[in-house]
Swiss-Prot record:
Keywords linked to the UniProt accession: Antimicrobial, Disulfide bond, Fungicide, Plant defense, Secreted, Signal
Protein name, entry field: Putative defensin-like protein 55
InterPro entries given in the database record: Defensin-like_dom
Disulfide bonds: 39-73, 43-66, 52-71, 56-72
Signal peptide: 1-19
Amino acid sequence: MNITKAYVIFFLVVILTNSLSNSDALASSVIETTKNDVCSTPCTIRYGTFECFQDCILDHFRDGNCINGRCCCKY
């Protein structure tokens, strides 16, 4: 009886853990960056969205923004 109870508890813990995990985090970051053409420089507190945008415009891109910690420029 104790072994069956342990298996049921283990099964429920696995199901609960799986349902609470955020499996969309990686997929959303990949989908979001595929809309951009070049992602190079890491974004920091000192190198933010404004600096990223300026660098992208100076490099003849149409747009630029910090996405997932990287400066991504669009053609």
